[in-house]
C-alpha cells in the first residue's frame, strides 16, 4: 500500500489509547495511484487535508503538526528544509534562544514505522495557543512536567521562542511563531486580504480566478475544496446550523457563532495595542487599530471616496451600479436602500426617534446616536500627536489633523475651492446648484443644511439654548451669546478699574 504521508499518531489528553491516521485515511496501491490524473491526485490531497482539519476541530492533539504542510508539498525534501537557516535567531525573540539543527539520523522518520505501543503522555504544550482557536490543537499540560521525549522519534529539535512548544521541523516553527505574533506576510493583489501562509494565498486566489472543481448551481461561483463550497451554499439556502444556547439565535458559520457567544459571556480576547480597547473578534480589533492611524487604503474607483477595509469599498461601489429605487418627493433625491431613504425623510420631517437618555438630544439615525453617546462616556481614543487634543471619532480626528498639515483633499469642480471634509464640499456644492433640501413646515422657508433648518426653527419654538451664567440672559444663536459674554467681561473690567 502506498501512502503519501507517514502514519501520524494523534492523542487526546482524556484517552490514553493511540489512534492512527490510517484509520481515517484513504490509501491507493501503486497500480491504482498510477491510473489517477493530476486533478484526481490534487483532489485526494484536499480530501486528506479536510480530514485532518475536521479531526483537529473536535479536539484532537496531533503528535506531528506538519501534516498540512506535507500534503500541500508531497514531494518536499524535508532534509533541505531543516538545514535551511538552522542557526537563525528570530528578530521578535521572546527568550533569546537560538535554533540548532537535528542530527541526520533523526530526519529519516518517514522510513520508520510507527509503533502501535507508543502511548500518549502529558506533554508540555504552548500556553499561548495557535491563532485558530477553533481547532483546539493546544491542550494545556501539567505545568509541573517538562516536554516528554518520543521513544520512537526522539526529541523535537526546533524549539519555539514562545514558551512550551517544540517542533520536529522548521516550517512548523515558523507557522507557530506567526500564529503568536499575528503577522500575515502574504497579501492578495486582487482584494488586499492579508494571509498568514503562502499555501493559503494560492488557495484564496482561486476565488478571484473563478476556477475550481466545485461549482455553485445557484450563482456559478467555483471553489477549490468541498468544505468551502458547502459553506457557500448556505448563503443561498439560508441554512443556519449553529444555534446559540443562550438566546436561540442561529448562524450559518461556526466562526460567527463563536464570536456571538462571546457577547453573552463578555469575553473580549482581542485588545487594541494603542488604547487597550477590547473586541470579540480579530477583524473588529484590526479595523479599530486602523482608525488610530487614520489609514484609508481602499479607494472607490468611481468617486474617489476612501475606506479602511476592502469590504466597505465593495459595499460602497454597489451604490454606483445599483438602481436608486427610493426617490424623495420633497427634494427629488434618489437613494438605493430603504434605510437610507427613511433616514433622509426624517431630515425633512424633523423626526428624531433616537433620543439620548443623558441629555435628551434626538437623532435621525442609530449611527449618529451611537456616535453621540461616546461624548458622555468621556472616551476619546483618537489623540493628535501634534497638539495632544483627543477625539471621540476617527473622522473628527482625521479632520483635525488636516488643520496642522493644511491638507484640503476635497476640491469643487465648479470653482476650484478646496475643503477639508466631504460634507463641507457637499454643502458648498449647493451654492452652485441652488439646492435647498431642508424646508420649514411652519413657514415654508428652505435651507441648504439640516443645521440651518434646526437653528431657524428656534424662531417658531422660542427655544433659546444659550444661557449666560452671570446674568441668566438666554440667546437663540451662539454668535449673540458669545458677543454678550465679551461685553460682560469688558463691563467687569471697567468696573474693577473704577474701584
UniProtKB/Swiss-Prot annotation:
UniProt subcellular location: Nucleus
> One biological process GO term for this chain?
regulation of transcription by RNA polymerase II
User: Keyword set for this entry?
Assistant: DNA-binding, Metal-binding, Nucleus, Repeat, Transcription, Transcription regulation, Zinc, Zinc-finger
One GO cellular component term of this record is: nucleus
Looking up InterPro entries in the UniProt record yields: KRAB, KRAB_dom_sf, Znf_C2H2_sf, Znf_C2H2_type
Q: Where are the zinc fingers (C2H2-type)?
A: 186-208, 214-236, 242-264, 270-292, 298-320, 326-348, 354-376, 382-404, 410-432, 438-460, 466-490
Can you say what this protein is called? Answer: Zinc finger protein 439
**From what organism does this protein derive?**
Homo sapiens (Human)
| Species lineage | Eukaryota, Metazoa, Chordata, Craniata, Vertebrata
Amino acid at each position: 500500500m502506498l501512502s503519501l504521508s507517514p502514519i501520524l499518531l494523534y492523542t487526546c489528553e482524556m484517552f490514553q489509547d493511540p489512534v492512527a491516521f490510517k484509520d481515517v485515511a484513504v490509501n491507493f496501491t501503486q497500480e491504482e495511484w498510477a491510473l489517477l490524473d493530476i486533478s484526481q491526485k490534487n483532489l485526494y490531497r484536499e480530501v486528506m487535508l479536510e480530514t485532518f482539519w475536521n479531526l483537529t476541530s473536535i479536539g484532537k492533539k496531533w503528535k506531528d503538526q506538519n501534516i498540512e504542510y506535507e500534503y500541500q508539498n508531497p514531494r518536499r525534501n524535508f532534509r533541505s528544509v531543516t538545514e535551511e537557516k538552522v542557526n537563525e535567531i528570530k528578530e521578535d525573540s521572546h527568550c533569546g534562544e537560538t535554533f540548532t539543527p537535528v542530527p541526520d539520523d533523526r530526519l529519516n522518520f518517514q522510513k520508520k514505522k510507527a509503533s502501535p505501543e507508543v502511548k500518549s503522555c502529558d506533554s508540555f504544550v504552548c500556553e499561548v495557543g495557535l491563532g485558530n482557536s477553533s481547532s483546539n490543537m493546544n491542550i494545556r499540560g501539567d505545568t509541573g512536567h517538562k516536554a516528554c521525549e518520543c521513544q520512537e522519534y526522539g526529541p523535537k529539535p526546533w524549539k519555539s521562542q514562545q514558551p512550551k512548544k517544540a517542533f520536529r521541523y522548521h516550517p512548523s516553527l515558523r507557522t507557530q511563531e506567526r500564529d503568536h505574533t499575528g503577522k500575515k506576510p502574504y497579501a492578495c493583489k486582487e482584494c488586499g486580504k492579508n494571509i498568514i501562509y503562502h499555501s493559503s494565498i494560492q488557495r484564496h486566489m482561486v476565488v478571484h480566478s473563478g476556477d475550481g472543481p466545485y461549482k455553485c448551481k445557484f450563482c456559478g461561483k467555483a471553489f477549490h475544496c468541498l468544505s468551502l463550497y458547502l459553506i457557500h451554499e448556505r448563503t443561498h439556502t439560508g441554512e443556519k446550523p449553529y444555534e446559540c444556547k443562550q438566546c436561540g439565535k442561529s448562524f450559518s458559520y461556526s466562526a460567527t457563532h463563536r464570536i456571538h457567544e462571546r457577547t453573552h459571556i463578555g469575553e473580549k480576547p482581542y485588545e487594541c495595542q494603542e488604547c487597550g480597547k477590547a473586541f470579540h473578534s480579530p477583524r473588529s480589533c484590526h479595523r479599530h487599530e486602523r482608525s488610530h492611524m487614520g489609514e484609508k487604503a481602499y479607494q472607490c474607483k468611481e468617486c474617489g471616496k476612501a475606506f479602511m477595509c476592502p469590504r466597505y469599498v465593495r459595499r460602497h461601489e454597489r451604490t454606483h451600479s445599483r438602481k436608486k429605487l427610493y426617490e424623495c418627493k420633497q427634494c427629488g433625491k434618489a437613494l438605493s436602500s430603504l434605510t437610507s431613504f427613511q433616514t433622509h425623510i426624517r431630515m425633512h420631517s424633523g423626526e428624531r426617534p433616537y433620543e439620548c437618555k443623558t441629555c435628551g438630544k434626538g437623532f435621525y439615525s442609530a449611527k449618529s446616536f451611537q456616535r453621540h453617546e461616546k461624548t458622555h462616556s468621556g472616551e476619546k481614543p483618537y489623540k493628535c500627536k501634534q497638539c495632544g487634543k483627543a477625539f471621540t471619532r476617527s473622522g473628527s480626528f482625521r479632520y483635525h489633523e488636516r488643520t496642522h498639515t493644511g491638507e484640503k483633499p476635497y476640491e469643487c469642480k465648479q470653482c476650484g475651492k478646496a475643503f477639508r471634509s466631504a460634507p463641507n464640499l457637499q454643502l458648498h456644492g449647493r451654492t452652485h446648484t441652488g439646492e435647498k433640501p431642508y424646508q420649514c413646515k411652519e413657514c415654508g422657508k428652505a435651507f441648504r443644511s439640516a443645521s440651518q433648518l434646526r437653528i431657524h426653527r428656534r424662531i417658531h419654538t422660542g427655544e433659546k439654548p444659550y444661557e449666560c451664567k452671570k446674568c441668566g440672559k438666554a440667546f437663540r444663536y451662539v454668535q449673540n451669546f458669545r458677543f454678550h459674554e465679551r461685553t460682560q467681561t469688558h463691563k467687569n473690567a471697567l468696573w474693577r478699574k473704577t474701584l
